[in-house]
């Protein structure tokens, strides 16, 4: 709600958060209580799919409240102007619908494409900057990736040690990026994990993610309770969304986002446990 309020009254434009040349008419990006619009968007990507499942699982009174919350959340993520957040939420919805009934996927894709001409001009222009190397934030990320490449050449096997503070100190032993500063993290969950823990740590992390997703999908297919299936599909969708965002953002930099990440991981684990219990009862 506070994010929607900020979108209504407007917030100060922060030049470091948006390219003022390519997005000249774009208003300030809302951040709610999270100080950073991308972090706010990450929270919404992880939680909005659960809200959608709550809407489907509730009776009429619960549907009213969850629908209101869902609409407010969708509006708020629009006001963040977070491109990675939009991509993550779109993927989360597609995964959610694909698990429930894959026939929904072509329909939602057609609706999404048909809606593009009706988007506000500022959002449409923001979408067009995705992948544009002239955009300052895109250029900033590629500069960080280049510095990370230099670091990986020295530490790819054993890593530099746990924590973004350690990574920041090691970055300061390499040349600065184009604006004269040093990166504080890699702007990528997987590069960050690799840089901190080495190649074995990265492989273990990827194995954990794949195992959890595989367990979730198997439990979804085995579950008989439609409410559990919806909740599990939502959790898997939100998890896929935040994993994709992790390609462009270090989503664990802020503890609150890391907490929600592991909360979502735990929701999948809890649903898997419930699905197994239900299966055991049916076979007993």
Model-derived segments and their meaning:
Residues 36, 74, 79, 146-149, ...:
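A conserved mid-to-late transmembrane alpha helix and its immediate loop/hinge
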Residues 34-37, 81-84, 183-188, 249-260:
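Membrane-interface catalytic loops of GT-C/OST-like multi-pass glycosylation enzymes that act
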Residues 17, 131-146, 154, 158-197, ...:
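Long extracytoplasmic/lumenal interhelical loops at the membrane interface
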Residues 21-28, 91, 126-132, 171-178:
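Short glycine/proline- and charge-enriched loop/turn segments
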Residues 103, 107-110, 208, 237-284:
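Transmembrane alpha-helices of multi-pass inner-membrane enzymes
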Residues 5-10, 80, 97-138, 146-154, ...:
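A membrane-periplasm/extracellular boundary helix in multi-pass inner-membrane enzymes
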Residues 55-62, 219-225, 270-284:
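Membrane-interface junctions at the ends of membrane-embedded or membrane-associated helices
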Residues 1-26, 32-99, 106-114, 118, ...:
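Alpha-helical transmembrane segments of multi-pass inner-membrane proteins
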